[in-house]
Every structure is written in C-alpha cells, then in structure tokens.
Amino acid sequence: MHKVIVFIFLTLYSLKSYGNDVIDKPHVLVSIAPYKFLVEQIAEETCFVYAIVTNHYDPHTYELPPQQIKELRQGDLWFRIGEAFEKTCERNLTCQQVDLSQNVSLIQGKPCCNQHTTNYDTHTWLSPKNLKVQVETIVTTLSKKYPQHATLYQSNGEKLLLALDQLNEEILTITSKAKQRHILVSHGAFGYFCRDYNFSQHTIEKSSHVEPSPKDVARVFRDIEQYKISSVILLEYSGRRSSAMLADRFHMHTVNLDPYAENVLVNLKTIATTFSSL
C-alpha cells in the first residue's frame, strides 16, 4: 500500500512539474505541424511550441473551436503561413505575428483551394529552398524576441541550414532517376517541390473541395492518356475518397503521402523517393 501511495505522489508531482514548466516557458504558435518541428529544432527547450492544426485535420478547411481560441491567447509569438483559418486567429490574438511566406519565391496565381484568402500556393514548406529562407526568418525572430537565447538559436539555425543543403543534394540524386515526370495527385500540394525538382503536377481535386465534376473527370483522363500516368498520389485528409474512386475507375496504382507530416526533413525525402518510383 505504501508503494502505491508513493507511486501516485511521484506521478502527480511529475505532472505538476511538467505543467509548471510549460506555463513558465514562452508559448510559440505555429499554424501547422511541420513548423512545430522546425521551431523545436531551433529553440530546443526554451519555448513551448504549439501547432494550431495537427496533422489529423485538413488546414484548408479547418475551423477553430472556441476552446482552442482560448488556448491560443497564451501565445507569445505566432508564425503564420497564409491558411484561411488564420483569419479567425488574427481576430482573436494580440501576440506578435510573423508571416513565413515573406522573402519566399511564391507560386503566384489561383491558390489550390478557394478557402484561401491569398493569391499564392501556401504549401511553401515542401521545398528545402523555401525552408532555408523560413529557417532564417524563424532564427532572426526568435533571437530578437528572446535575446538571452540568441546564440543557441543561431547555432541551431546554422545546423538546420546545413541539413537542408544536404537534403537538397540527396533529393537531387534521388529524383535524377525518375522516369515519370508527370505526377497525378488528389490535391495540389506539391507545386514547390515539383518546381524545384523538375516535375509537373496534375490534380484531381480543383479549388472547391467538392467531388470532381464530369468535366474534371474528363480532364484527368486526358492527362492520364497524354502523359501515360499509371499512379495517383492520395493525400491524408484531403480528397481521398473521390480520388480513390477515380483511381479504381482508371485501374491506377495508389500511393499515400502526408504533406503535413511533422518531421518535414524526413517527409521531403519520402516524397522524393515516392515520386521517383512512379
């Protein structure tokens, strides 16, 4: 009995300590999980990093519940990327906001989804080149906000930049072996990756997040025939059902990818390997 009481006491104490530790740290908000990974690589334990949308939801259609808005008000700093749900955050948050699309070479024009209030492709993290710019923005912002940790941030930022350079070289090697340069995807998430590594992206789902129309189906069929595409990439949480049905209709192989996976460095290599094996 004594051992049980001691165990319960130690468990409660550790939970209390963890809670106080989180409360004592500055809260840094990021819009999606890949940036949680990046900020944590740079800031280590100096900040508590909170992803507004986890990779269990589609950020394009996400709606913040009232309880989450209350939690977000603890934020001391917010790195945003241009998603539609950020408008709700903007109206309810007073913390410093930093747009990570700044200084990035953006793909302009009609966005991938009509939920967006931007006129550019917001999937900027799916490119090592873009990530290098964003890492520099994160390091500069954190160093100014929390100057007592600036040396740590700058050191970790340099390591991350080197890792991104190495990743870019690895992806170039992997993708150089690709035989198919035309990629069919359920949702247009890979514009920056395709631009950087010489692929062409063809999408099933257009900007409306609704079932493909007969016109869309005809367009997809033309792309399949013209470019001899034999596989379709299905994305987690976006357009899976309708795209899977089309893949079955056209007797195509399906591959699953998650553009919002938290470890973006590993994910980019996974994307490269997947594209090159189609």
Curated annotation (Swiss-Prot):
InterPro entries documented for this protein: Bact_metal-bind_prot9 (IPR050492), Lipoprotein_PsaA-like (IPR006128), ZnuA-like (IPR006127)
Signal peptide limits: 1-19
Highest taxon in the source lineage: Bacteria
Alphabetical GO biological process terms: cell adhesion; metal ion transport
A molecular function GO annotation: metal ion binding
Protein family: Belongs to the bacterial solute-binding protein 9 family.
Function (record text): Part of an ATP-binding cassette (ABC) transport system involved in metal import. Binds a metal with high affinity and specificity and delivers it to the membrane permease for translocation into the cytoplasm.
Protein name, as recorded: Putative metal-binding protein CP_0211
Organism listed in the record: Chlamydia pneumoniae (Chlamydophila pneumoniae)
Source lineage: Bacteria, Pseudomonadati, Chlamydiota, Chlamydiia, Chlamydiales
